[in-house]
């Protein structure tokens, strides 16, 4: 699982989900990529699930890059707890994703297999996304 090693503050405010991505909008490492089309919080478990889906489909001969990192904690209070008494404890680590951000990149010689692998990964993510190539832009 992807989690930060050390954080300055254990609990944070929720980041705003508005605007479009200013950086990381083009495929820079691989040949194909998954580009987000809407705002979302993507958890470390969802990132890991998508990575496993890609790796199982391509088997060997390809390389995968993960361009997002879950660096924000989301908190939750226990069930059946009265209101008040402070903020809940951190439960998940999430990455704040904006439209246009390239989440995963893949380098693989066969285009059809690469697109199938990325499609499987998109189904594991909680957002609408599309497959882009190195030549395409947002």
Swiss-Prot record:
- Record has Ribosomal protein as a keyword: yes
Gene Ontology terms, MF aspect: rRNA binding; structural constituent of ribosome; tRNA binding
**Disordered: annotated segments:** 1-24
- Spell out the protein name for this chain: Large ribosomal subunit protein uL16
- Subunit structure and binding partners: Part of the 50S ribosomal subunit.
Q: Which family does it belong to?
A: Belongs to the universal ribosomal protein uL16 family.
Q: Which UniProt keywords apply?
A: Ribonucleoprotein, Ribosomal protein, RNA-binding, rRNA-binding, tRNA-binding
The record's GO CC annotations read: cytosolic large ribosomal subunit
Q: Which HAMAP family match?
A: Ribosomal_uL16
Gene Ontology BP, a term:
translation
Report the protein's function.
Answer: Binds 23S rRNA and is also seen to make contacts with the A and possibly P site tRNAs.
| Native organism | Mycolicibacterium smegmatis (strain ATCC 700084 / mc(2)155) (Mycobacterium smegmatis)
The Basic residues compositionally biased stretches are 1-13
Q: State the NCBIfam families in the record.
A: rplP_bact (TIGR01164)
Please give the PROSITE patterns that the UniProt record associates with this protein. RIBOSOMAL_L16_1, RIBOSOMAL_L16_2
